[in-house]
Amino acid sequence: MDLHTAVYNAAHDGKLLLLQKLLAGRGREEIEELLGEVAGGGTPLLIAARRGHLDVVEYLVDNCGASVEASGSVHFDGETIEGAPPLWAASAAGHLAVVRSLLRRGASVNRTTRTNSTPLRAACFDGHLDVVRYLVGEHKADLEVANRHGHTCLMISCYKGHREIARYLLERGAQVNRRSAKGNTALHDCAESGSLEILQLLLGCHARMERDGYGMTPLLAASVTGHTNIVEYLIQEQPGHGQLSGTELPGEGSSQMAGNHCSTPEEAEPYESCCPTSREAAVEALELLGATYVDKKRDLLGALKHWRRAMELRHQGGDYLPKPEPQQLVLAYDYSREVSTPQELEALITDPDEMRMQALLIRERILGPSHPDTSYYIRYRGAVYADSGNFERCIRLWKYALDMQQNNLEPLSPMTASSFLSFAELFSYVLQDRSAKGNLGMQLGFADLMGVLSKGVREVERALQLPKEPGDSAQFTKAIAIILHLLYLLEKVECTPSQEHLKHQTVYRLLKCAPRGKNGFTPLHMAVDKETTNVGRYRVGIFPSLQVVKVLLDCGADPDSRDFDNNTPLHVAAQNNCPAIMDALIEAGAHMDATNAFKKTAYELLDSKLLAKSTMQPFNYVTLQCLAARALDRNKVPYKGFIPEELEAFIQLH
């Protein structure tokens, strides 16, 4: 173990005497170096603050000159927090004595992490009320500094269910109607976490029932998460039935703080006087809650109970609230339509599958196609069908969800990427199942695979149309890899000449985009790289793949394309010891003597132990023109500007 690591470990374990011994007699510069970051990004002071070793913290600051503001990486609950100052770590862990000590020694009370989280937010997250009181009461910590998502200290306290911290923040003037980047408020966080007491507290402080960026009210948020207690409280009988938002709440006009914050929560107005819920909103909340009971709680009888109440409210007083008529019935939902009468509703009890379709229909109507839960539960239902062997039904639902995601989410959304990967894994399983069972297995058709492959290419096209190109982002690389896996599977399906033509057209669309993955890899580079195999938890295709390489070459992939290290696909194939693929690339016109940034040819990268290296004769593929190009490069003969551009590119290749 080196000295740097030994110092860090001593600070981690709180071994002050050992730490003093390790640092004794060393010069200032050496001590500064030893107190710097270790390989994981942490520092001795940061880890000592995280672990609550007060004596070590004070020794490092007072005797060794460690900076109280030096940030680093620290781990909490399995997550790595980047750019965390020692005060943040001590606050998050609830070590009040260390917090006091660091602040007395000049630590900034509002210093943030890389994600803009303050020490106060860290203390609010895990419910350290004593630390919160000290930071705010003694050092005037800013209550309103939000993290990079616009999420405030009050919001996280509400979400985590820390009632006393929420009460204290409200007493100190926290803005109760502050919105995050996605438009949600502290009320939304209460509704999502099921914290009814805090929700009552916020409502008493004039919290408004606003809609977030997805159009969700706190009432709908409670329905989506299945918190029946919140839903029941918010839809209780009101003296009047106003709108959920957009109307002035009592008291707002007379008091400036009514819509902002509440200084005395104990004197809060009762809920009934400030936030009435309309009949329509109550109906939707109950219907959505029923859908949650079906898909999340898997309680069909509980769902039916909530849907009955919603139906009663729709017909209340003879003033019927009709459901909107669907524009068209959906194949993925088995052409189901929402029930509209009590008789139709009661008939569902004999048809559990129809109840599940009702849940999907209700969720799509109320939340809309852009809400993540809509497509998530469609995919979930499809997965349940797949688990029971009903692959056709699964594929229909997943295709519908994928169309929804591509039409409503940004390109390369993690949810869309997950859909593509799920398709690839499902298709791989079905093909293996068919191979094992013969005619008894499901017949996976060309249209199924081709449809998803085409949508995958469309996703790449959408990503490349963004103002900022994705470059070598991991998500973009994964998207290309999944397309190659789908192509790998498609090669296992028999095609007619017209289907073969359609497949080649789609691959040509991909190549025309000229997408580049990690390290500037083209699709052809990725097809000859074994790393492309690792795309998900389950194996789909095996790479390098000669079949995929041949399809790419047939569709016009450039065998001499270069990555950021000037490697051609031939170089990558050689690094992966694939002589058969090298032969295919050479036959397609790849230059055997092309050199990379390290002046190595593909032949030189081949494993010398391979029999193929001894049988492969590079001079069989080298022309006089190639030898001349290498001679010019080797002898540093100036040629740029003196010869045609095509020849310049040819020389640079060598």
Swiss-Prot record:
Single GO MF descriptor: molecular adaptor activity
Residues annotated as transmembrane: none
TPR repeats: 283-317, 375-408
Residues in the signal sequence: none
Annotated pathway: Protein modification; protein ubiquitination
Keyword Phosphoprotein: yes
Xref: Pfam families: Ank, Ank_2
Modified sites of kind Phosphoserine: S108, S608
Family: Belongs to the fem-1 family.
Name of the protein: Protein fem-1 homolog A
Species of the source: Rattus norvegicus (Rat)
